[in-house]
UniProtKB/Swiss-Prot annotation:
Keywords: Cell wall biogenesis/degradation, Glycoprotein, Glycosyltransferase, Golgi apparatus, Membrane, Signal-anchor, Transferase, Transmembrane, Transmembrane helix. It is a single-pass type II membrane protein. The gene is GATL2. The chain crosses the membrane at residues 5-22. Residues 1-4 are cytoplasmic. Glycans are attached at N190. It comes from Arabidopsis thaliana. One of its GO terms (molecular function) is polygalacturonate 4-alpha-galacturonosyltransferase activity. This is Probable galacturonosyltransferase-like 2.
Amino acid sequence: MHSKFILYLSILAVFTVSFAGGERFKEAPKFFNSPECLTIENDEDFVCSDKAIHVAMTLDTAYLRGSMAVILSVLQHSSCPQNIVFHFVTSKQSHRLQNYVVASFPYLKFRIYPYDVAAISGLISTSIRSALDSPLNYARNYLADILPTCLSRVVYLDSDLILVDDISKLFSTHIPTDVVLAAPEYCNANFTTYFTPTFWSNPSLSITLSLNRRATPCYFNTGVMVIELKKWREGDYTRKIIEWMELQKRIRIYELGSLPPFLLVFAGNIAPVDHRWNQHGLGGDNFRGLCRDLHPGPVSLLHWSGKGKPWVRLDDGRPCPLDALWVPYDLLESRFDLIES
């Protein structure tokens, strides 16, 4: 009886250290380039390599499990995984987060960049969901300022998605010379719902969406974007987004976090990407996060935008059917894994 009790305490101690002290992740396999890939192994600074595929993401403890799944899915489906360079933006605990990444992906090419939360916090207005108010959710606004000036193009990815196709196809999206970013557009969405009656009733504001636009403004999801960083810097687009955020602090013109300023600046002026690259909304709406089905058509990227995240629903024992597609990319060690180790 005494020995069983000691064994129980030992197992409990393992759980306490591993789960209360932080999540523990498995090491991912190493992935190798196909023979036709150019090599960046000999580049003095892979961070600036023009032969690399550059991916930008945010990294924090709340979404770390999702971020690890994104990384694995990108590498697993890439024909040139050794040519992918990740650029992680983080607001705090960067050393701890770096250790997690290195432990699971020892061969990953990446760099971590600090993000000044204090500089953005005063510009954030409350939205319909608290997760949308996180300062790190606004880091995409500042990528051109945070990342090295040697970078000309980057794919930005949220932490609640997985790829099931080669990211090089997305990275090589054609972007016209007078366009700054590319993303899947959804012109059947009711664009008016993204802004308040105050916005639409003020002609000096609402006319913004009809001035200097290449096409009719349409909704696009900012969780998957191909961004031309040099064009962004040349056009001073960070300042343009900040101006709308400053106005929002004085007059409430939208409700949905970091998305509306992007729409105000870029909608109608983006390069469209095939919808297969953002099967979004799998997290349900922003209030209940109910289960949803895939949109019709082929799929290259699954995106759990909305309130419901697959890892949360799985842990709660209430997964949606499509959450099963996320599970193979989950690197979190189960309690069984921990006991066996």
